Structures are given as structure tokens and as C-alpha cells.
């Protein structure tokens, strides 16, 4: 599942000091896009590195080129078409999408190198149809669907229509609760939501960003695998993954020697008599091992770089993304752990040390030096045959990993 986006609009007439608190809150909450008027783009970008969208407001349907030339002079990332056009009812809807003025503007903006969003107020069924048609036939990067007076709209039809299209659906929401509904509709949900700063308290921005993060989180069905073998195997280069996040007891990362079977390696968040806890760290294993990262992908531990994202996973299989801050690669004694689940054999290699833990089936951490055949620990196992990975992406092919 791709990340859910949060957009915040401060594109209203007013003093900058009225808009600034919303922009600051948006940047601190990590929103994806801030919508503002052209004269505010520079001010927004001075406050933080954030994508900025600007409405294209031609004075008349005949002057779009002039408006686009004016936008060329500012540092906007996304152009929003539809305000003052067909999208908001200022111009009648076309009989055919090939005659659409908004569609022509989308093409012109795209030719100038902008990302493009089509703004559509869903005033009635024909406007819902127009939003779907422009997504399918013109392919803007985004369609922003807003209800009349920003009232929440039924998204089921648009979500179903846009399944498989490259255009992302951004739904208008009046608060965090409406955002949650948008993200959960038909299980898939909208790709993002747009909050209007004129209609919300700034606190709704952070709440919505948190909901978006949870909505996009992957979840794994962890199973209890039976340990078959535990043995020292000599020295090798192992990797500690130091993140920019703190982990709690019961959290770690999924790591394994094969992509179809990965053990939950516990974080160094536990008290022990040897070293101080380092709750930002997972001593993950040797350089060859796979680790789960967002988007249904894996990476080799040796491939990770500062700034990459990895998945933190808890004992219930819930996930959250964390940014890698540092990798520590050191030569250490290693241990092979081999396990089995429903006839599928999986294995991993870890540092042979008291401070490295897996997780028992009851959720309790267990040091790898205390593991023995017959013990059961938590892991993620892909039991479906015929799937392999190329460059970390799951593909249908025959690959045997031992």
C-alpha cells in the first residue's frame, strides 16, 4: 500500500500571519502538500522543504497561457486546475471530455513540467462522472474531490472507478475523523485528503497526519515457527540498524536469509547487565540478510543507507516506518537459526551474543543464546509457492533459496 497523503490549503485571501500557524503546523506534522496562493509560495518554502501546490486562476477561459507563464516565475510544484473552470462549476461541463477546457489546461501545465491536479466540486452525479472521466482520459497526477460546502461525499464510486489508474484521489475533509473515513472507504480508501485551513483548528492537522500514517501501515500475519537448529558458524560482518525512532519492548524488525521467511528480531530496548539499552537499534544480522521495508519490499542489509526507511514491527504484526540514521557494520561471531512452519523451512543468521533477542510465541523476548530446538518464535512466512523477488519486489517466478 502506498503512503496516504495529507494536503492542507491556506489558499484564502488574508494576512500572512493568519496563514502562517497552519503552515508551521503542517510542516511540523509532515504533511505532503501545502496549497497556497502564488504570492505565498516563497513564504511557505522559507519555513520548510515541502511540496507546494498553487491554483491556476485564469481571468477568463481564454487566458490560461498567461496564467501559466506567471506560474513559471514562482517555485510551485503542483498546478491545480478546475477552480474558475469546469471543476467548480464556473464553466459548464463539456458534452465530451475531448472538448474540456480543464483537460486542455492540464495538458498545458504538464507540458511545462508541473505536476497537475484537477479540482472538482462534486455538486451532483455529472460532476462525479466528470472527475472519473478526466482521471481516465487525461491522467492528471491527482483529482481533488470536494463536496458542496466541504461536506463529506460518498467516495465509493470514485475509489472504484480510479482503481488501477495512475491518478491519485485526494478527498476533501473537514477534520481528522472525516479523513479517517476517507482513508478506510472500501478498505482501499482515498490516496489522500485535503484540509481547508479556513475551516479547521490547527490541531486537526497533526491528528490527520497520524491517522494517515496508521492507514498506510502494512500489517503482517506473524506465526509461531518451530526452531530446528541453532549452531555457531564462525565470524562475519553483521549490521546494526540505528533508526531515528525509539522502539518499545515487543518491537523489532523482520529479517531473514530468504525473502519468504523472516524472523522478528527484537530491538535493543531491553534492560540487561551488559550494556545500556539502545531502543533506537536492531542488531539485525549479517550483510546478506533481507530486511522488510515499506511498500511490500525488501532490501539487503548491506544496501541500506542513512535516510532509507525500514519497517518497525510489533508482536501483533503492526508496522510503522522508521528512518535509518546510521548503520554499524562490524565483524562478529555468528549463529545460524533454522526453523520450520507447515513444511516451509526458513533461516537467519544473527550475532552470537546474549543481547540479541527473538520473540517467543507468547510475545516474550528470548535471547538467541538460550534458543534450542523445539522452541517456537515469531516470524513472517510466505507459504504461497512460485513467488520470488527481483530488486526487492515480489514477482511470479520460480526461485529456490536455501
Curated annotation (Swiss-Prot):
One of its GO terms (biological process) is aromatic amino acid family biosynthetic process. Pfam families: DHQS. Keywords: Amino-acid biosynthesis, Aromatic amino acid biosynthesis, NAD, Oxidoreductase. InterPro entries: DHQ_synth. GO terms for molecular function: 3-dehydroquinate synthase activity; dehydroquinate synthase activity; NAD binding. It comes from Methanopyrus kandleri (strain AV19 / DSM 6324 / JCM 9639 / NBRC 100938). The lineage of its organism: Archaea, Methanobacteriati, Methanobacteriota, Methanomada group, Methanopyri. It catalyses: 2-amino-2,3,7-trideoxy-D-lyxo-hept-6-ulosonate + NAD(+) + H2O = 3-dehydroquinate + NH4(+) + NADH + H(+). Coiled coil: none annotated. This is 3-dehydroquinate synthase.
Amino acid at each position: 500500500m502506498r503512503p496516504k497523503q495529507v494536503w492542507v490549503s491556506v489558499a484564502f485571501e488574508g494576512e500572512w500571519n493568519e496563514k502562517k500557524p497552519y503552515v508551521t503546523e503542517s510542516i511540523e506534522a509532515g504533511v505532503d502538500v501545502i496549497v497556497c496562493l502564488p504570492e505565498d509560495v516563497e513564504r511557505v518554502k522559507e519555513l520548510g522543504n515541502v511540496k507546494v501546490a498553487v491554483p491556476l486562476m485564469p481571468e477568463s477561459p481564454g487566458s490560461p497561457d498567461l496564467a501559466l507563464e506567471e506560474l513559471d516565475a514562482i517555485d510551485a510544484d503542483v498546478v491545480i486546475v478546475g477552480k474558475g473552470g469546469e471543476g467548480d462549476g464556473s464553466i459548464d461541463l463539456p458534452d465530451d471530455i475531448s472538448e474540456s477546457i480543464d483537460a486542455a489546461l492540464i495538458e498545458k501545465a504538464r507540458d511545462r513540467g508541473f505536476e497537475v491536479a484537477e479540482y472538482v466540486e462534486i455538486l451532483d452525479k455529472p460532476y462525479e462522472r466528470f472527475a472519473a472521466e478526466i482521471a481516465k482520459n487525461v491522467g492528471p497526477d491527482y483529482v481533488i474531490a470536494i463536496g458542496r460546502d466541504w461536506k463529506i461525499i460518498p467516495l465509493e464510486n470514485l475509489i472504484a472507478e480510479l482503481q488501477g489508474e495512475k491518478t491519485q484521489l485526494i478527498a476533501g475533509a473537514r477534520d481528522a475523523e472525516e479523513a479517517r473515513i476517507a482513508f478506510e472507504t472500501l478498505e482501499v480508501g482515498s490516496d489522500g485528503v485535503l484540509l481547508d485551513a479556513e475551516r479547521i483548528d490547527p490541531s486537526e492537522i497533526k491528528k490527520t497526519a497520524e491517522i494517515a500514517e496508521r492507514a498506510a501501515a502494512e500489517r503482517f500475519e506473524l506465526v509461531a515457527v518451530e526452531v530446528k537448529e541453532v549452531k555457531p558458524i564462525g565470524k562475519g560482518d553483521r549490521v546494526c540498524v540505528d533508526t531515528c525512532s525509539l522502539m518499545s519492548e515487543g518491537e523489532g524488525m523482520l529479517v531473514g536469509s530468504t525473502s519468504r521467511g523472516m524472523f522478528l528480531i527484537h530491538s535493543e530496548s531491553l534492560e540487561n547487565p551488559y550494556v545500556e539499552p539502545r531502543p533506537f537499534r536492531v542488531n539485525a544480522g549479517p550483510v546478506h540478510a533481507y530486511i522488510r521495508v515499506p511498500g511490500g519490499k525488501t532490501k539487503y542489509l548491506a544496501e541500506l543507507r542513512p535516510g532509507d526507511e525500514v519497517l518497525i514491527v510489533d508482536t501483533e504484526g503492526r508496522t510503522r516506518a522508521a528512518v535509518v540514521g546510521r548503520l554499524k557494520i562490524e565483524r562478529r561471531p555468528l549463529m545460524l537459526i533454522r526453523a520450520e512452519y507447515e513444511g516451509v523451512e526458513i533461516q537467519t543468521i544473527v550475532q552470537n551474543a546474549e543481547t540479541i533477542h527473538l520473540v517467543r510465541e507468547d510475545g516474550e523476548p528470548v535471547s538467541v543464546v538460550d534458543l534450542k530446538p523445539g522452541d517456537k518464535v515469531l516470524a513472517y512466512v510466505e507459504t504461497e509457492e512460485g513467488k520470488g523477488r527481483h530488486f526487492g519486489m515480489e514477482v511470479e517466478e520460480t526461485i529456490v533459496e536455501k
